[in-house]
From Swiss-Prot:
Function: Binds oxygen cooperatively with very high affinity because of a fast combination and a slow dissociation rate.
Organism this protein belongs to: Mycolicibacterium paratuberculosis (strain ATCC BAA-968 / K-10) (Mycobacterium paratuberculosis)
UniProt xrefs under CDD domains: TrHb1_N
GO terms assigned for molecular function: heme binding; metal ion binding; oxygen binding; oxygen carrier activity
Stored InterPro entries: Globin-like_sf (IPR009050), Globin/Proto (IPR012292), Globin_bac-like_CS (IPR019795), Hemoglobin_trunc (IPR001486), Hemoglobin_trunc_I (IPR016339)
Family annotation (Pfam families): Bac_globin
Cofactor binding note from Swiss-Prot or TrEMBL: Binds 1 heme group per subunit.
Transmembrane regions: none
Superkingdom of source: Bacteria
Reported cofactor(s): heme
PROSITE patterns: GLOBIN_FAM_2 (PS01213)
Keyword Hydrolase: no
Lineage: Bacteria, Bacillati, Actinomycetota, Actinomycetes, Mycobacteriales
Name by which UniProt lists this protein: Group 1 truncated hemoglobin GlbN
Similarity-based family: Belongs to the truncated hemoglobin family. Group I subfamily.
Length: 136
């Protein structure tokens, strides 16, 4: 039976592994929040926020969403974001900053598209408005 193991296809690497794992996500998230906080349309959402804690949770979330080894332990997206006035326009801006941070970190454009595709279904839990109105 050991011979059969040699002919099995290797499991495809997760996006998490392909982009460099936890350390790469820390770099991306740091750059991402520099961009988000510099955006006048978004910075107000973070007034009074413990950014170190938020960045840690964001890394944990992205790691879990992209096939990392550990589950996300934060509160549900809807619970965290409800009542904050986040619109689909804001969601699109954030997605654009994420794409830019990933690209700046050297993530290939095809992988950036995969990541945005993995995050897009969360739009209705984070923002108010129609999910189809997200533009990046």
């Amino acid at each position: 039976m050991k011979i059969l193991a040699r002919f099995r296809k290797a499991e495809p690497a997760s996006i998490y592994d392909r982009i460099g794992g936890h350390e790469a996500l820390e770099v991306v998230v740091e750059n991402f929040y520099v961009r988000v906080l510099a955006d006048e349309q978004l910075s107000g959402f973070f007034t009074g926020t413990n950014m170190n804690r938020l960045k840690g949770k964001q890394v944990e979330f992205f790691a879990a969403a992209l096939g990392g080894p550990h589950p996300y332990t934060g509160a549900p997206m809807k619970q965290v974001h409800q009542g904050r006035g986040i619109t689909m326009h804001h969601f699109g801006l954030v997605a654009g900053h994420l794409a830019d941070a990933l690209t700046a970190a050297g993530v290939p454009s095809e992988t950036v598209s995969e990541i945005l595709g993995a995050i897009a279904p969360l739009a209705p839990e984070i923002a108010t408005g129609e999910a189809g109105k997200v533009t990046v």
